[in-house]
């Protein structure tokens, strides 16, 4: 078991490397979701009816979520045994290779039933690798930072969500400018193949990183656990459950904003799709700027306090947001998305990395935070757009969706309140008053 022997790199460089990985994670998610709606039913499930083709296509999308907790367990186990850096390289390669291969996959017309089977296998591999990305990226950023800058640097992996959203939205918008026949023939593949560029950049940076100082200390003190996953559940089962509950609102809100609201705006509110996508792009850019600002602020005022304020703001924003969207104005739809995705989510999202990771001991931290995070995604994020669509279909009112978002926010407030605070300075001093 080796620790890093290189010269220690700056916390900023580590944070940027973490940011690139989580950007790829959300970029891959969004381009797959978009392709699942627009392209995959025709290319991989042409024998099915249009409705069945869409269902089958989104079923392959859901398969990726099923694989995430398993990825979190495996990457967490080895991340707590052989190091964070090595597992982050593996997760980035796993995500990138799977995504690029999807972009190269022959269609049903070319290789028959093997096409949807291979699509499902690649989606499983992609989800497995994603399961280990966020936890490892967050730990590298937080554990390389000094105690008084953990909130700021811990926000960089969180920035990957809006950055990936903006990148994917732009990539598919540009590809969709092709004539329909060319887009269906080869244009849809371009966003998947572009993922290779992000992967190469990320690898160049990650391979030059040193191991996390806190993991190196665990190794030097001979405190590496034989079965970190077992130790995590034995000592920190409560924190795992609380992390899952605390993240629930962020995951649900994010997936509603980027996966459901565009569909809602274009169908129920009559807003032009191009304008709706542009609004997502702008809101995502606002979030990229806001997350590190709130992360830095949390280093002064306390992470848990800012997290709870953020979740309450998210809940408070939902009824005004839907009121703005229901006007049918593209401009007000943009204002609504900036309000919820760019600003209301920022206080909680900006501090999540440091708050969640530092709730666990260093020897089982990768396992604990990865399991809590991926569990929340399966229980909340994966089904959020479907639940929202079902609620609207049953009630024909956006109020039902708003109350759903308020309910998940309430769960996160309770879980966040019970989640142990980081006791390093200055958080402990702030919490104690």
Residue locations for each model-derived region?
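Cytoplasmic membrane-interface "Motif A"-like loop-to-helix N-cap segments
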Residues: 81-93, 300-311
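C-terminal transmembrane helical hairpin of 12-TM major facilitator-type secondary transporters
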Residues: 305-351
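Helix-to-loop junctions at the C-terminal end of transmembrane segments
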Residues: 72-83, 291-303
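Extracytoplasmic gate region of multi-pass secondary transporters
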Residues: 33, 237-286, 380-384
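Multi-pass alpha-helical transporter architecture, strongest
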Residues: 202-209, 407-433
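C-terminal ends and interior cores of transmembrane alpha-helices
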Residues: 93-111, 313-328
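Helix-loop-helix hairpin linking two adjacent transmembrane segments in secondary transporters
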Residues: 161-206
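Glycine-rich segments within core transmembrane alpha-helices of 12-TM secondary carriers
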Residues: 152-173, 373-384
């Amino acid at each position: 078991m080796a620790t890093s022997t290189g010269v220690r790199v700056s916390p900023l460089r580590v944070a940027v490397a973490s940011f690139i990985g989580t950007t790829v994670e959300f970029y891959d998610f969004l381009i797959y979701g978009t392709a699942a709606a627009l392209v995959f039913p025709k290319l991989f499930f042409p024998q099915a009816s249009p409705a069945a083709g869409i269902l089958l296509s989104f079923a392959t999308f859901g398969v990726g979520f099923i694989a995430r907790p398993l990825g979190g367990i495996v990457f967490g186990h080895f991340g707590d045994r052989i190091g964070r850096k090595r597992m982050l390289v593996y997760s980035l390669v796993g995500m990138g290779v799977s995504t690029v291969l999807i972009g190269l996959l022959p269609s049903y017309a070319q290789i028959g039933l093997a096409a949807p089977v291979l699509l499902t296998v690649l989606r499983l591999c992609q989800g497995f690798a994603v399961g280990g990305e966020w936890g490892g990226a967050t730990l590298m950023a937080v554990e390389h930072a000094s105690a008084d800058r953990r909130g700021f640097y811990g926000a960089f992996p969180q920035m990957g969500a809006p950055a990936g959203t903006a990148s994917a939205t732009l990539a598919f918008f540009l590809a969709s400018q092709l004539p329909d026949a060319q887009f269906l023939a080869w244009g849809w593949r371009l966003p998947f193949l572009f993922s290779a560029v992000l992967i190469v950049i990320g690898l160049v940076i990650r391979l030059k990183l040193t191991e996390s100082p806190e993991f190196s200390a665990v190794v030097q003190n001979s405190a590496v656990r034989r079965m970190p996953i077992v130790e995590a559940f034995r000592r920190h089962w409560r924190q795992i459950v609380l992390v899952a509950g605390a993240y629930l609102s962020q995951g649900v809100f994010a997936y509603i904003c980027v996966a459901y609201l565009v569909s809602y705006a274009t169908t129920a509110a009559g807003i032009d799709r191009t304008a709706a996508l542009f609004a997502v792009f702008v809101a995502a850019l606002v979030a990229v700027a806001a997350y590190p600002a709130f992360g830095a602020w949390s280093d002064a005022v306390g992470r848990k306090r800012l997290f709870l304020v953020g979740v309450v703001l998210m809940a408070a924003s939902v009824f005004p947001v839907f009121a703005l969207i229901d006007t049918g104005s593209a401009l007000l739809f943009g204002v609504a998305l900036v309000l919820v995705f760019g600003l209301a989510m920022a206080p909680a999202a900006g501090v999540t990395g440091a708050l969640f990771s530092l709730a666990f001991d260093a020897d089982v931290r990768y396992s604990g935070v990865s399991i809590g995070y991926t569990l929340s995604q399966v229980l909340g994020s994966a089904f959020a757009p479907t639940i929202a669509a079902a609620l609207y279909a049953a009630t024909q009112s956006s109020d039902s969706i708003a109350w759903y978002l308020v309910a998940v926010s309430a769960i996160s407030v309770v879980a966040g309140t019970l989640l142990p605070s980081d006791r390093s300075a200055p958080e402990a001093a702030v919490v104690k008053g």
